[in-house]
Curated annotation (Swiss-Prot):
Organism classification: Eukaryota, Metazoa, Chordata, Craniata, Vertebrata
Gene name of the encoded protein: lmbrd2
Naturally occurring in which organism (per UniProt): Xenopus laevis (African clawed frog)
InterPro entries in alphabetical order: GPCR-associated_LMBR1, LMBR1-like_membr_prot
Protein name: G-protein coupled receptor-associated protein LMBRD2
Extracellular side: 1-3, 54-122, 189-203, 426-449, 512-538
Stretches with biased composition (Polar residues): 643-657, 701-713
Length: 713
């Protein structure tokens, strides 16, 4: 099995990353470079998480072989080679004859069972160098550049590159600042001599220092909030009330995004009417129009008059710099509008599902009934296995208890992590619980247990860190939505974030397990992953101070999160957060409940209309001859005159002579709901009279109506 397990995991992890990217991204609409860059970033990060357990089990086996090697010398220890970070197993047994060496090796193999996932020497260091440096190139250079390049408002490749370099100066400046400070520290220290390997170690330490700084802050929030969210999710009505609260806040943001988009489209319309077809900047305007939504493009295309010349001296034309700024505003406004639309649709589905769960809890039939059908078609396997009865037992009975059990398990896991983060620096006695578990498994040669514990621990820490990023309001610009609804900017941000935080996260975990020799202070073989990080003894300030004591800050952050100190502070600053004992929370919850009711009525009217249309078609089917004859008549029909239009309009309000005609009229009238209001709804994104975009479907009091009495009838 030498190397087979590594090959299997490399292939399996690639297909896992490809499957997840296909679920969240859109291969057809998004740029190929975005897809390839995100896939590579996710793939490398998943490789680190999945291969670290194999590296740990292989290192434990190699240590066992070195420890049980039989030699006539009084001591038999593993010696560190002169080259930093490279470990040599040269011991006193090198002076034995070849037969004694073979006999010593056989005795070692008999006492140390080889793991099923054993990886031969020399493979893992090369593998980790390729994975680590590729991920660092992606997270620090390529992906930030791609992200800024995609948002740039320039119209040429040179302009986009220039803008991307300027915007990424803060990232490059932060990295160079940390690297320069460490470089000055090493240069000033008279006991240290700069070499290429030491410069490489300084660069790695700078990246890991920046990652660990963010890691502890995010982990302190996630270790408490994830178990608490699972526990609160089992409470009746808690998730539904929180969803109502989110709906009210998201609708406010959605309305603001719509207004921003309309304002930007108004500016685009003015520029489009000002710059004609023969203007030198017309290509720039066409590029801006391609980024606009389809309905706005059609309206602007119909209103454009290409026969007017641009050489009128009284008109002031915008400059190229103004168009670049407008182009960037269009990209941001369209992306924000799309994000709020996607998040709103996801939130509606969650609210409808939670309301269905609340209704079905009192059902005597014990069969789960959905108010609306699923948006995505279910597979025949789910339809056969996940029946309404099974769904009722799961959603109404089993799921709350499973959430409570999972919350208790996660809380215990979080306690272990916090305790280990505060005590992992103690080598004698060993206080870190992760180190205790690994050492016990090392004595019994239970490699499966070692790999499972390592994988679950890293997976839990990753969820605590990454889920916190997408929960924080500051990062609400980015989101991950399934069913191909994640935009390119969020995909690039997620890949950049994963590559930036995963290496220091795994290095921190190896420190918790004392697999890092800089923590255990033993002259034993380190893991291949920690060996490529170099000897941090080059930087004693980082190795002995920051890496040891800074993770203890996670305890303070967990206490602050448990008492919701951050939430209360944000609430006082005006950023409304969900708090059960707050009047503003109650008001927003009631407002969100009304919004969900309104959306449910709209969805119900659409469902009823589709049902009546299907029934009408089944009841009065038309044959192919009538259909073909009607098509031929309509194709030869001329434009109707004013008299014909008046006749058709008046016939809508006359009584039908037979039942078929009455059904047809009823079907046509169903297209407009009972509470339809022409003042609040406009199919045209551009109003022909005022020349300004009119929003459709405004929210609550933001939509003005001449008659509001029968709006909700």
């Amino acid at each position: 099995m030498s190397g087979v397990a590594l090959g299997i995991e490399i292939v399996s992890v690639f297909f896992l990353a490809l499957f997840l990217l296909h679920r969240y991204g859109d291969f057809k609409k998004q740029h190929k470079l975005v897809i390839v860059g995100t896939l590579l970033a996710w793939y490398l990060c998943f490789l680190i998480v999945f291969i670290i357990p194999l590296d740990v089990s292989t290192t434990i086996y190699n240590r066992c072989v070195a420890r049980h090697a039989v030699t006539p010398a009084p001591s038999n220890i593993t010696v560190l080679s002169p080259t930093p970070g490279i470990v040599s197993n040269t011991t006193a047994q090198n002076h034995l004859p070849s037969a004694d060496k073979l006999r010593s090796s056989d005795n070692s193999l008999e006492e140390c069972s080889k793991p099923w996932s054993y990886i031969p020497r020399g493979i893992m260091p090369i593998f980790w160098r390729v994975v680590y440096w590729t991920s660092q190139f992606l997270t620090w250079i390529l992906m930030p550049f791609m992200q800024s390049y995609a948002r740039s408002g320039g119209f040429s490749i040179t302009g986009k590159i220039k803008t991307a370099l300027i915007e990424n100066a803060i990232y490059y400046g932060t990295y160079l600042l940390i690297f320069g400070a460490l470089l000055i520290y090493v240069a000033v220290n008279p006991n240290l001599h700069l070499e290429w390997y030491q410069l490489q170690t300084i660069g790695i330490a700078a990246a890991n220092t920046w990652g660990l700084f963010l890691l502890v802050l995010l982990m302190g929030y996630g270790l408490v909030e994830i178990p608490r969210s699972q526990w609160n999710g089992a409470k009746k009505g808690y998730l539904l009330m929180k969803t109502y609260f989110k709906a009210a806040k998201l609708m406010t943001e959605k309305a603001d995004a719509e207004e921003t988009l309309e304002d930007v489209m108004e500016e685009v319309r003015k520029v489009n009417e000002c710059i004609k077809y023969n203007h030198p900047l017309r290509k720039c305007v066409d590029t801006i129009l391609k980024k606009c939504p389809a309905e706005y493009q059609e309206k602007m295309g119909r209103n454009m008059d290409d026969y007017e010349d641009f050489e009128e001296k009284n008109i002031s034309y915008p400059s190229e710099k103004t168009l670049v700024k407008l182009h960037k505003q269009v990209i941001y406004a369209v992306q924000r509008h799309r994000r709020t639309q996607v998040q709103w649709s996801i939130l509606l589905e969650q609210a409808f599902h939670l309301e269905d769960v609340a209704k079905n809890e009192t059902s005597a039939a014990k069969q789960f009934v959905h108010t609306f059908p699923h948006q995505e078609p279910e597979s025949w396997i789910m339809r056969r296995l996940y029946t309404p009865t099974i769904e009722w037992y799961w959603e109404c009975l089993l799921r709350p208890w499973c959430s409570r059990i999972l919350a208790v398990i996660l809380a215990l896991f979080s306690t272990v992590v916090v305790w280990s983060e505060c005590t992992f620096f103690s080598a004698k006695p060993v206080l870190s619980l992760f180190a205790v578990f690994i050492q016990q498994a090392e004595q019994t040669h239970n490699y499966i247990y070692v790999e499972v514990v390592c994988f679950l621990s890293i997976f839990f820490l990753s969820i605590c860190v990454y889920s916190t990023v997408f929960r924080i309001r500051v990062f609400n610009y980015y989101y991950l939505a399934s069913h191909h609804q994640t935009d390119a900017y969020s995909l690039l941000f997620s890949g950049m974030l994963f590559c930036r935080l995963t290496p220091p996260l795994c290095l921190n975990f190896l420190g918790l397990t004392h697999m890092d020799v800089s923590i255990s202070h033993q002259n034993i073989e380190p893991t291949a992953y920690t060996s490529i990080m170099g000897s941090l003894r080059v930087l004693p300030l980082i190795a002995d101070v920051f890496y040891i004591y800074y993770p203890m800050l996670v305890l303070i952050l967990c206490i602050a999160t448990y008492f919701s100190l951050g939430t209360r502070c944000l609430n006082l600053l005006g950023f409304q957060q969900f708090m059960g004992d707050n009047d503003m929370t109650s008001d927003l919850t009631d407002e969100g409940k009304e919004l969900i009711k309104r959306e449910k009525r709209k969805r119900q009217r659409l469902e009823d209309g589709e049902t009546r249309r299907r029934e009408w078609k089944e009841r009065y089917p038309t044959n192919r001859e009538d259909t073909s004859r009607n098509r031929s008549v309509n194709s030869d029909q001329k434009e109707p005159t004013y008299t014909e239009m008046t006749t058709n309009r008046s016939s809508k309000y006359t009584r039908a002579s037979n039942r078929t005609e009455r059904d047809r009229i009823e079907l046509l009238q169903d297209a407009e709901p009972l509470d339809f209001n022409a003042d609040t709804f406009n199919d045209d994104p551009l109003d022909s009279e005022s020349g300004r975009y009119q929003p459709g479907g405004r929210y609550l009091s933001m939509s003005q109506s001449n008659s509001r009495i029968f709006d909700d009838v």
